[in-house]
């Protein structure tokens, strides 16, 4: 690798920008990882302290942290655990609450097909860790998940967590030990003992080194009735979930709008938290609270915006260093 110092810096900044775009993760989604970590006697307090995660947040399932922080948390857990299949083993801790309101919506659907139809509209409530796609394959169907995280090791464990949790939760919903036809994993073929572990969880043909991460199963399973469904409760939960998705999207827009306003205001000098809150017609405290709910804080957004502007100026290379420092 013959990258110059400047190229390496640019690449590092590009990766940092990618990490900044990891969205959010619900506290509910984090719990599975922490339950396995506690079972393995990992030092969760020390890990949270190292990455700057406030443990108080973790007691409220309605809260969110940034995707970047979630990725750091999983990386830190993996570094401390000797479990090569940590992600796969988290699936045993899945419960309706792991999927936020989506979990309770799923419980009140009529059948498995209806459950799957609810994933895409509401998966944002669980977090922005990945995107689910669902496609027919003749007499079979394929449900695949594309992880949006950037750390390859974290991604592998997240994929295992996601697919194994889906299957474990689906079996719980229908009280029926149906097995998929095939599991496709992008990871390379692991050791024989690890292959046996995948086999024990999924109980089907497992293909490694694939171009996607997906579960394939018979179409007939979509009509399996759920043993716990309540259609009246379902519509109430869906209305609630729709308003939560709307609020989450609005809050993400707040962060984007704030970045835009900061960029404008850095040129005028009125860029303090109080100034920004006034622009949005809210108090500084409210702004602080809404940013905290996104796993963000005002100072880090200000620093990021300054850095982005400096990089933009450097890229244009028409401004000399004196002009940059004066801003």
Q: Model-derived features: where do they sit?
A:
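Short acidic/histidine-centered micro-motifs embedded in hydrophobic/aromatic stretches
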Residues: 50-54, 186, 327
